[in-house]
Curated annotation (Swiss-Prot):
Residues 30-112, 175-197 are extracellular. It comes from Danio rerio (Zebrafish). Gene3D superfamilies: 1.20.140.150. This is Germ cell-specific gene 1-like protein. GO terms for cellular component: plasma membrane; synapse. Residues 266-278 have a biased composition (Polar residues). The keyword tRNA-binding does not apply. Residues 266-304 are annotated as: Disordered.
Length: 304
């Protein structure tokens, strides 16, 4: 039983650790959602000859009329972007690298409260995962008493379940805020196409591992309690079977006195024969006292 319980505890610790790593990685990265944004092409210059609009005339001459034969989507450039809880980064079309902006500032004013609530829920989710992981490790490595281990196991399961619920709420709130920002966000930011990224997948993978760890912990707690109840039932059954061989007075006598004092003064005859069934478990009364004078007279007669 001890080996099985330890294996279940190791599985719970491993799942909780995976959930903690996934959630922390998703929280600090900016790939929850990614896609493309449609922006007007910049004018061509000496440093930029591709993905730009070339009018073919001197742009600094105000007397010249500028014509462009590009129409439709040819007039636009599709740049890549990716967004997380904290920042939204897009490709810089005027140079190399990326340009990042705060996603909280991009969200509509009516949704910023929900976004902040999502951030707080994510932080609490990670903190409760840390607490649950610490309790599981404490139960696994520092608990020699089974009863103390059960208490730690129960608290770890409660904290893990609460963290999973908070994580689920946080992920759903962020998804709602992002979808509203896509429709009502700034014109220069609104995505043309978008999809969920690997950070979003890691966040929900963390939730899955968290709930699996909580279920495993609860299962370990339940199985241990059931095993203890079964052993206690067997012990009480064996105690009742032993009690049937003794009458109540003798049973209480044996329970109250030590074995040494009983063996020196009492003989117990648990007769199993059919003819001695009525005398089973009874104490033999001590022999009747013998007169000391009769003993001396008999000894004198024998000597004569």
């Amino acid at each position: 039983m001890k080996t099985t319980r330890k294996c279940r505890a190791l599985l719970s610790v491993g799942l909780n650790l995976l959930a903690l790593l996934f959630s922390t990685t998703a929280f600090i990265t900016t790939y929850w959602c990614e896609g493309t944004q449609r922006v007007p092409k910049p004018n061509c210059s000496k440093d930029r000859r591709h993905n730009c609009i070339d009018y073919g005339v001197n742009e600094t001459d105000p007397s010249k009329v500028h014509y462009s034969w590009e129409t439709g989507d040819d007039r636009f450039l599709f740049r890549h972007f990716h967004t997380g809880i904290w920042y939204s980064c897009e490709e810089n079309i005027h140079g190399g690298g990326e340009k990042c902006r705060s996603f909280i500032d991009l969200a509509p004013a009516s949704e910023r409260g929900v976004l902040w609530l999502s951030v707080v829920s994510e932080v609490l989710y990670i903190m409760l995962l840390v607490v649950g992981f610490s309790l599981m490790c404490l139960e696994l490595f520092h608990s020699s008493n089974v009863i103390d281990g059960l208490k730690l196991n129960a608290f770890a399961a409660v904290f893990t379940v609460l963290s999973g619920l908070l994580g689920m709420v946080a992920h759903m709130m962020y998804t709602q805020v992002f979808q509203i920002t896509v429709s009502l966000g700034p014109e220069d930011w609104r995505p043309h196409t978008w999809d969920y990224g690997w950070s979003f997948c890691m966040a929900w993978g963390s939730f899955t591992c968290c709930m699996a760890a909580s279920v495993t912990t609860l299962n370990s707690y339940t199985k241990t309690v059931i095993e203890f109840r079964h052993k206690r039932k067997l012990f009480e059954q064996g105690l009742r079977e032993e009690q049937t061989f003794l009458d109540p007075e003798t049973f209480h006598y044996f329970r109250d006195r030590s074995v040494q004092s009983i063996s020196s003064s009492v003989d117990v005859y648990p007769s199993h024969g059919s003819s001695h069934g009525n005398s089973r478990g009874k104490m033999r009364s001590p022999p009747a006292p013998v007169d000391q004078g009769d003993n001396t007279e008999s000894l004198g007669e024998e000597q004569c």
